Structures are given as structure tokens and as C-alpha cells.
Amino acid sequence: MPIEQKGRTFASQKLKGKSALRYEIAVTILTGEIAWINGPFQAGEYSDLRIFREGGLQHAIDLGERVEADDGYRGDPTTFRVPYEVLTRQNEEADNMQKRVQGRHETINARLKKFAILRERYRHDITQHGYVFRAVAVLVQISVKNGDPLYDVDYKVNF
């Protein structure tokens, strides 16, 4: 989410050094509902893994529960299931299932970005950005529940 702030702590690698904010969004695997939103965080200062550990989601999940995640969370295999680096026949099915789950999460992200206020430069207080982000997330969730559903994912918990 581009913002008006300047400096290294806001610089986003994804946006080639432009200032931005990060949010942590968790989507339930079985229903596709947005279950957790945390942020805003300064893009250059907080990695995905740091946001997870310091932002509260780590303490909100059940002990022993594993989270489907992308490569930004590599390094904690007891908590995260990230894509396999080397595919074998045994883990190919699990990897394909995970890609479908991540694709559905990316669909939520794309729907959030359809709102210009999250796509364009933001020039107001960062706290207000958090309010706006959450309001947009509620609108996206309402749309998922009432006529624009996500595609189904057949998820097996045998990894």
C-alpha cells in the first residue's frame, strides 16, 4: 500500500524502494473467510516472519497448529508449511494443494487492491490507514459471502 512517508523503515522491496505499509491477513483454509488482520507495519522494518511473531497471530493459533504460508515465512517448519524447494512425487500433491490455498488468499488480496484507496498513494495518518484497510476488508468479506464467492479448495490435512 503506497504511502506519503519517506525513509528506509517504510521502503518496500516489492515496490522497488517506494514507501509502503504492510498488513498481515489470515484466511481460513476451509471457508475462505478473513480471520485475522494486523497492521499497519512499516514495510522496510518488518518482515512477514517478524510481523507474525510480534504481531499476535503466533499467540492466536492453537499450540501445534501449522499455517500454510509463502516463502516469506521459511525458517520455522514447526509452525509454517511453505512450498517445497525440491519436488518429489510424494510432496507434489501437497505442494499443488498448497498452491490452490495460496491462490485463494491471493484472490482476497486482489479484491482488496481493487479499492483505489489501497492501491493509490495515501496522504493521511497511518492509524487512519488501518481503519480504512479494515473497512475495505469487511466489504470484501461481505462480497464473498453474498454473491462473489471464492473457489472451493479440497484440503487434506495429511502433511
Region spans (language model):
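Short, well-ordered secondary-structure "scaffold" segments embedded in the functional core
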Residues: 1-159
